[in-house]
Amino acid sequence: MEIGRLRARWLTDYRASQMRYRHMLGPALAGLVLSATADAQTRDSTRSSSRATCDSPCPKRTPNASARPRAPKPEWPVRAPAPLPGSILPNNRILAYYGNPLSKRMGILGEVPPDEMLDRLQKEVTRWAKADTATPIVPALHLIVTVAQGHPGKDGMYRARMDSSLIERVYGWAQRKNALMFVDVQVGKSHVRAELPWLEKYLARPNVHLAIDPEFYMKTGKKPGTVIGSMNDDDINYAIDFLAGIVDKYKLPPKVLVIHRFTQNMLRNYKGIKLDPRVQIVINMDGWGNPPLKRGSYDRYVYAEPVQFTGFKLFYKNDKRFAGWRLMTPEEVLALIPRPVYIQYQ
């Protein structure tokens, strides 16, 4: 895998990160502005509104028959099959470091030398264990094994698969700390059905789990980084069946499947996602911003559409990108409803 190719991928990833911030703002912003060179983000003007007042008592309003009814309150915890023996969730909390060793810009996993990275991971584990003494913390390394690209590549799929030597290297780091490993897939213009089978030899190990990033699943035919991609229930159900088959074939404990999300359309028809006791599903709130923005996105895209378990991503740099922004503390994340059982640092 050429470093230059990953650098090119990070240009598109930076563009996508700009979109990520803007989508987290929701109705406060209109439109989408991409910039390959500007660090500043262009905000559209927002409309101001004031509450109407009356000199005399205001007349009673007749309810609008066409008004949108209030959505029912989401049901948490989700009614799901009882956990099988060996299940990690919900009686543990996973704490993962995310990235790729070939790039210092894709996350903490590749930003610092391995020994320093593992030491920092252990310190985070200790910090989270103190914040919630009732829930054991399980460390993990979350490796992007299929990286979306800004160029088509030889097969025109706009994605690059990491070679086995890199995957085994990161797996060795995980083994040193008795940590889990997640293999993360950015599908590009390929299909989830084509991008999972080659990972079977890694997923056959009891401590290796799967993640898929809908942001880079380009079903519309657009290039990665130009628009935000999406997955539907059929895609996720295929991944669930694939993992369940591996659990049965190799007689393994249940697998964890992480699906990233930070917009409405990244995950479509969530009610059609089937629950299988052999696969534990985490919807991971993946957007970056200040605490109010992140809490709002969690409520809108994760809490409001229950699947099974929830996750929350924290960005060491982007969550502090602008003046007044800061990284959320473990205590603040644990105050979310429902409490995330998967924590990821990038």
Describe each PLM feature range.
Residues T226-I343:
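Surface-exposed substrate-engagement region within the catalytic domains
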